[in-house]
Curated annotation (Swiss-Prot):
It catalyses: (2R)-2-phosphoglycerate = (2R)-3-phosphoglycerate. Pfam families: Metalloenzyme, PhosphMutase. Its cofactor is Mg(2+). Belongs to the BPG-independent phosphoglycerate mutase family. A-PGAM subfamily. This is 2,3-bisphosphoglycerate-independent phosphoglycerate mutase. It comes from Pyrococcus furiosus (strain ATCC 43587 / DSM 3638 / JCM 8422 / Vc1).
Length: 411
């Protein structure tokens, strides 16, 4: 029996809701996607709930679920994955956080992403914090992608029950850090001191002086959340399925998840995880990796950002760019020898400007697939698909079975 290879493509935040501006269509339905529509015609569609119906999923828990893990058992906070994704090697007693560079004016957060500052600016600001902030514990502060960064408090894992200072919307002041026990109280006090001292460093930094003169939001404040410790990963993906797996990813969080479950991670030049990402560089790398790997995962981030920014036409344009990326892959493989799955890690509807509990469209095509009667890849067409409505953790087992890499249960 011939074993096939697998390609899993996640278009981050793909799912959406009908939008008046797009004639009542979703961005996916509005976009011109000839390659995904072709795959829909020769493949099978469905809907998937990353966690469960009606439950908005974080990108971390959603990816864990899609890779086949129970996030309720495996997940111990986002911070660890963020830190792993920026190349940090953590000890089991370290406590990691995800961080946003933000804009603070008159005690109020006016922009949670500091005008989406560039990765280069964020890295320079992070370096200034690492070199100029002094707190009672050893720490690592490192820029990630765009406005994102990572904070690690060495040896403070017992204080993981600490809250966050992120108000989650502009126009509100930062929250005080909450705590549940003495260990987390100590962490909360350290974080308050860290944020205060970092603000002093950031507010007068030359990058922010320049941004002020240009009328851009300054990155003068840190929003800290997602306390995370070592996750509970019972078995690596690569061990469970006996495959050699690679990930083509730019975003730190998703890099971290992939690394944690045993993937080799690649970030080709030009892949940024931002609007300016080079999706064709990802396509070329994926095709190259398929020569040596059994399973290749490709992550495309900008669709999610457009949903958060409530920009439906941009989201549609980004989906069209993703379609061209997928075309390159399809043109360079034999679909009889490969199983391709395309979905999102969650829905990020433009009207919500955040993750929602809406199901996500799912497409599977390639060797062994029993095609249904769907004609186009979109949310409403997916409702008619032969896969029905499944959970995110069902995707990989379905792929592996089509790849002829599963074993019989029972005699």
């Amino acid at each position: 029996m011939k074993q096939r290879k697998g390609v899993l493509i996640i278009l981050d935040g793909l799912g959406d809701r009908p939008i008046k501006e797009l004639g009542g269509k979703t961005p996916l339905e509005y976009a011109n996607t000839p390659t995904m529509d072709y795959l829909a015609k020769i493949g099978i569609l469905g809907q998937q709930d990353p966690i469960k119906p009606g439950q908005p999923a974080g990108s971390d828990t959603a990816h864990l679920s899609i890779f086949g893990y129970d996030p309720y058992k495996s997940y111990r906070g986002r911070g660890y994955f963020e830190a792993l994704g920026v190349g940090l090697e953590l000890d089991e007693d370290d406590l990691a956080f995800r961080v946003n560079f933000a804009t603070l004016e008159n005690g109020v957060i006016t922009d949670r992403r500091a005008g989406r500052i560039s990765t280069e600016e964020a890295h320079e600001l992070a370096k200034a914090i690492q070199e100029n902030v002094d707190i009672p514990v050893d720490f690592i502060f490192k820029g990630a992608t765009g406005h994102r960064a990572v904070l690690v408090l060495k040896g403070m894992a017992e204080g993981y029950k600490v809250g966050e200072n992120d108000p989650h919307e502009a126009g509100k002041p930062p929250h005080p850090f909450t705590w549940e026990d003495e260990a987390s109280k100590k962490v909360a006090e350290i974080l308050e001191e860290f944020v205060k001292k970092a603000h002093e460093v950031l507010d007068k930094h030359p990058i922010n002086e320049k941004r002020r003169k240009e009328g851009k939001p300054v990155a003068n404040y840190l929003l800290i959340r997602g306390a995370g410790t070592y996750p509970n990963i019972p078995m690596k993906f690569t061990e469970q399925w006996k495959v050699k797996a690679a990930a083509v990813v730019a975003v730190a969080l998703v890099k971290g998840v992939a690394k944690a479950i045993g993937f080799d991670v690649y970030t080709p030049k030009g892949a940024t995880g931002e609007y300016n990402t080079d999706e064709m560089a990802k396509a070329r790398k994926a095709v190259e990796l398929l020569k040596d790997y059994d399973f290749v995962f490709i992550h495309f981030k900008p669709t999610d950002a457009a949903g958060h920014d409530n920009n439906p036409k941009l989201k549609a344009e980004l989906i069209e760019r993703a379609d061209r990326m997928i075309k390159y892959i399809v043109d360079h493989v034999d679909l009889e020898d490969v199983v391709i799955a395309i979905t999102g890690d969650h829905s990020t509807p433009c009207e919500v400007m955040n993750h929602s509990g809406d199901p996500v469209p799912l497409l599977i095509a390639g060797g062994g697939v029993r095609a249904d009667y769907t004609e186009k890849f979109g949310e409403r067409e997916a409702m008619r698909g032969g896969l029905g409505r499944i959970r995110g953790h069902d995707i990989v087992p379905i792929m592996m079975d089509l790849m002829n890499r599963t074993e019989k249960f029972g005699a």
